[in-house]
Amino acid sequence: MSTIYRESDSLESEPSPTPTTIPIQINMEEEKKDAFVKNIDEDVNNLTATTDEEDRDPESQKFDRHSIQEEGLVWKGDPTYLPNSPYPEVRSAVSIEDDPTIRLNHWRTWFLTTVFVVVFAGVNQFFSLRYPSLEINFLVAQVVCYPIGRILALLPDWKCSKVPFFDLNPGPFTKKEHAVVTIAVALTSSTAYAMYILNAQGSFYNMKLNVGYQFLLVWTSQMIGYGAAGLTRRWVVNPASSIWPQTLISVSLFDSLHSRKVEKTVANGWTMPRYRFFLIVLIGSFIWYWVPGFLFTGLSYFNVILWGSKTRHNFIANTIFGTQSGLGALPITFDYTQVSQAMSGSVFATPFYVSANTYASVLIFFVIVLPCLYFTNTWYAKYMPVISGSTYDNTQNKYNVTKILNEDYSINLEKYKEYSPVFVPFSYLLSYALNFAAVIAVFVHCILYHGKDIVAKFKDRKNGGTDIHMRIYSKNYKDCPDWWYLLLQIVMIGLGFVAVCCFDTKFPAWAFVIAILISLVNFIPQGILEAMTNQHVGLNIITELICGYMLPLRPMANLLFKLYGFIVMRQGLNLSRDLKLAMYMKVSPRLIFAVQIYATIISGMVNVGVQEWMMHNIDGLCTTDQPNGFTCANGRTVFNASIIWSLPKYLFSSGRIYNPLMWFFLIGLLFPLAVYAVQWKFPKFKFAKHIHTPVFFTGPGNIPPSTPYNYSLFFAMSFCLNLIRKRWRAWFNKYNFVMGAGVEAGVAISVVIIFLCVQYPGGKLSWWGNNVWKRTYDNDYKKFYTLKKGETFGYDKWW
């Protein structure tokens, strides 16, 4: 029998003089333990990754060679008997200490949750209707909440005799309480996607929106997925391999802010405490962003080769070196936001093999294939920009969807025949094609690599063992029964039926069922993918395509099908991520369940309330010439997409112009099988084992609006971080996630201050450094061919 002791979290700025120790008893037969440790050693010795032994304790040296972060490898043993996580990135960020006696369910937790959810949801909703828009990142809430919580912890310790459970000062502001507030804000502060649907319906389809309908649409589209998140915990949240890398940045930030322990660890010669390191990075990042973000924006879009008089209007030069509509062949920037635009998830938390797979895909499809097809004028590509997120008509203007609508906003085929076919830039088409492949590849990959584990965990949720964090969590806290999540899901699906059937949505109930099934069927494969790689496959395109064939010429139905077919899964996976964060922070799962539902209800009410107020109090809202920029660009994009994707029959069916893209569904099936066969047949072929087909297909999914320029920057930074990891592993383990938290929080706070205090009131700084990068073909999204007035391009018949 072995015993692991964990000291309590420090509740104050100074270490507690009498830390609580909570023993965990782990029973195991000595023979099994010896055999297990022997298997661990054999597994580690068989791995080929090199490590830096300097400044690392012997226990961590045993497991550092096996890392999802470095090689995408999954621990094959049983982590039940390990004293810490088998993954070094988790060990370096997440503490195994816990004090379950810390009280969290008190007025201050709920007060801070309410205030931050209301403020962040309201501000983000307000600016979501403006272009350029502003979204305040939850990292800002995580940083700002800390001093406010510490101030509230200074209140006198008054109690009320009539309310015995009330205490004005429930104790020190702990990192657990901080985590509860942050988790609530992270899930609900961003504008609910349903609000873009409501904006499109109300402002562009002129639909009279009942307030009850708006609440139901927002709540159901978010909380149906919560049920799926809870019911799939055994596959998506609980396993040790479900790292959810993005959460490690938040964990490191909590630890940096709250821990005042004397750090004796020497990391490659560095002794600086992580808290001080975080503050230095945070302040430096905040101050520096003012330079590329406002004072000298040319340092952000650093296409310096195009600043000369001979290159700025040279189409070939702009195609090669352009940062906005070109290939970005000179990937240099002084602005971190250009890096973060590339992939979902922080570069500090994204495994290097994910960055490598993604960049390989970008090089093949967008640096090699795209220029070849563009300059051969395939599918009339030269009449459109090289990279663009817009669609065009046959006069090179952006496609005006209102020209093909009836008064009831259904599509009029006669008007479509009279107007123009839809032309899509090749960058957008490649993004569609890769998404088609990714949707299939994620299923094939999941079956091949995780199928047995999925079946085994279905039969026994503890199959494969539990790591130290899950053991602590399950011993110290009561879990939420599955029936809680099942009941939540049933209730929300029922309310979803009310929303789509009792109001004039033009969305049949059977289509609602199919949309929900798409989200639920994709949940486990997508959850496993995101938990390990920090990436996910967007279902927006495939749901629009499916609905376009099921319910052709019905754009209103297309809106709601995408909402329930994609956002239900997306929001559910966001909760899965936060459930993992709650496990890392050792916060009661029952409290998290209650807080998340409460925060979602409150944020939905705030979203709807703010948008309704704006509709009635801002003149010219959602018009293109609104003087303050409240043009509803997001709602307009959703509106346009719903109409265009109601016409897939005329774009992707047999004999139509873009039909060859449908072959990528087959590629998505065959490519993972081929890679798996090579890995199985040639196990010593190191290159093959690093190929991850879902990531390869879905990684470049942000192009457009991102460009290869952004992806080159992301890969370069990821490469440097991985080099540091290999050369100075101790330093990387101690400071990497803290550095990521400091950089991203500093930039996020700086963006908010610049926008609210300078740009929104009308402040401008017009000089050469802020204008030179705009005087290029790259910024103008120049086309290779320019038609004269009255000319058209394309084919004669498109129906």
Swiss-Prot record:
The chain crosses the membrane at residues 109-129, 136-156, 178-198, 211-231, 277-297, 314-334, 360-380, 429-449, 483-503, 509-529, 541-561, 591-611, 660-680, 737-757. One of its GO terms (biological process) is protein transport. It is a multi-pass membrane protein. Residues 13-26 have a biased composition (Low complexity). Glycans are attached at residues 46, 640. The keyword Transferase does not apply. It is found in: Cell membrane. It comes from the Eukaryota. Residues 1-26, 43-64 are annotated as: Disordered. The modification Phosphothreonine is found at residues 48, 50-51. Pfam families: OPT. One of its GO terms (cellular component) is plasma membrane. Optimum pH is 5.5. One of its GO terms (molecular function) is oligopeptide transmembrane transporter activity. Residues 1-108, 157-177, 232-276, 335-359, 450-482, 530-540, 612-659, 758-799 are extracellular. Keywords: Cell membrane, Glycoprotein, Membrane, Peptide transport, Phosphoprotein, Protein transport, Transmembrane, Transmembrane helix, Transport. Residues 130-135, 199-210, 298-313, 381-428, 504-508, 562-590, 681-736 are cytoplasmic. NCBIfam families: ISP4_OPT, OPT_sfam. Present with 2870 molecules/cell in log phase SD medium. High affinity transporter for glutathione. Also transports tetra- and pentapeptides like the opioids leucine enkephalin (Tyr-Gly-Gly-Phe-Leu) and methionine enkephalin (Tyr-Gly-Gly_Phe-Met) across the cell membrane. Belongs to the oligopeptide OPT transporter family. This is Oligopeptide transporter 1. It comes from Saccharomyces cerevisiae (strain ATCC 204508 / S288c) (Baker's yeast). The lineage of its organism: Eukaryota, Fungi, Dikarya, Ascomycota, Saccharomycotina. The gene is OPT1.
